[in-house]
A protein has these predicted regions:
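Compositional signal for N-terminal targeting/processing segments
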Residues: 1-268
């Protein structure tokens, strides 16, 4: 693999049978929004890959209100983690947007819109957020499960302003990655699930997406991990498959109790 660093945020990966232009964006920067649009229009790729999963894409584009959500359906479908994680992210993003004037993740949706207008197929390359939390949950002890819930609930309902120092740091990361890192500090035993696996999943999804020339838009915090994964795949090294990274181990009965409590905590 040949790696060409076009800038601090744009990297070209030249492989045997494909070319990947990787854009590591700052999710709270207007410059990132314009950069993504310009690169897609200039490069005219045959595929655009973005750092979203199907559930988060729908939550961003359909603008569903939690107030109108059928909580019984959420419980029945076992989507408590998804609801709590999205509540935490939405809260965090609102606080960031209020202080920066830019809606976090706008460049990701912008990439999808530019691609759609140009007739370019889009691949959603991130792992389902619920799968990530369920895998982390399965690796946690009862005490760590409580800490995981506490971290998510705290993020979901916090009104604390982000400091200037924290804001500068966030400009080089994406909000979900920041949330994952925060939980990894509290739960080092599941760092592999929260951080490393997600980089591997993104890297493999981008590598395996159809197309000879692809533009991939991801948070800057993922860049090195994704490049490393793609390099390993291009060299034929053994790396986890997407199926391996989405298997959710069967949980203990106590886990089901928590999954019922999560949506109840949100609406109470």
């Amino acid at each position: 693999m040949q790696l060409i660093n076009i800038s601090d945020t744009v990297h070209k990966l030249i492989l045997n049978d494909q070319e990947i232009i990787l854009i590591g964006t700052a999710h709270v920067s207007q410059n990132s929004v314009e950069e993504v649009k310009n690169i897609i229009e200039t490069e005219s790729p045959d595929r655009v890959c973005i750092e979203l999963d199907d559930g988060r894409m729908k939550s961003k584009t359909e603008k569903k209100s939690y107030e109108n959500m059928d909580i019984r359906k959420v419980i029945k479908e076992g989507k408590g983690f998804f609801l709590l994680a999205n509540t935490a992210l939405a809260s965090f993003q609102r606080r960031m947007g209020a202080q920066t004037g830019t809606k976090p993740g706008e460049e990701i949706l912008g990439a999808a819109e530019v691609a759609k207008n140009a007739g370019i197929p889009v691949s959603l390359c991130d792992r389902d957020i619920q799968t990530t939390f369920k895998r982390a949950w399965a690796k946690s002890s009862l005490w760590n499960k409580c800490k995981l819930l506490a971290t998510l609930i705290s993020a979901a309902f916090s009104n604390e302003e982000i400091t200037a120092e924290e804001l500068e740091q966030l400009k080089s990361q994406d909000t979900l990655q920041t949330l994952m890192q925060e939980m990894a500090k509290e739960l080092p035993m599941v760092k592999e699930v929260l951080i490393d696996e997600r980089d591997q999943y993104l890297g493999r999804s981008i590598f395996e997406a159809p197309g000879k020339k692809k533009v991939a838009v991801i948070g800057a915090g993922h860049t090195q991990g994704v490049i490393s994964t793609i390099e390993s795949l291009s060299e034929g090294k053994q790396t986890p498959t997407l199926d391996n990274l989405t298997i959710v181990p069967k949980g203990k009965p106590i886990g089901k109790v928590f999954s019922y409590l999560i949506p109840m905590l949100i609406v109470l």
